[in-house]
Amino acid sequence: MKVAFGMKAHSGWAALVVLGNRDGDFLVVDRCRVELVEDEWAKQPYHAAEDLNPDAARDVVLRGVATAYRIAVGEMREAVKRERERGNEVTACAVLVADPMPDWSIEEVLAVHFRMHKAEGALFRDALIRATKACGLRLVAIPEKMLTKHAESALKTPLSGLVKKIATLGKSVGPPWGKDQKQAALAAMVALQGPLEVKRSAAQPTSGNSRNRR
């Protein structure tokens, strides 16, 4: 069976819902929490670097970014492997994204507190996107605030119909089936429909721009 991933990132983890389509009906194949860090500080690497000297702060941030990317790729490969062992083919991965972040340097992010929150959110979304590409999956990056609109268009179904579909899926698997799972499932539905490509980027790379690279 062909399946698609739907993913919603948080600081240090992501919600994953795997959906398939059998005889025209969507079904939940799997859903789980994907851990994207090994250490507590890595959930907020910019915050961890906030009070350090510039060189040490940069090293901490870059280490956090590299670790998130590495873990995300490993977790994505494991998820694909699980589906192959079930006899399924993963056709795409939908990742919910936010508005692109300005191309701030690490120093510019650390200088303003709210930027740290934005950068950390972008980090884990970007990690999922990089992992999707590393595993050779078709990426469907969907702006979270446009998810319903894209779903209505891709599925040719009004909002009321989408709500019913998501509710039916939730009843079939039971809790947990909160906002994260619902949004990830809806994103996976969009991905299953075919090569929809949302051109909007997730976020600028969070390891800093060229001014910071040595």
Task: Please provide the spans of the model-predicted regions.
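Phosphate- and other anionic-substrate recognition elements at nucleic-acid/protein interfaces
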Residues: 1-201, 214
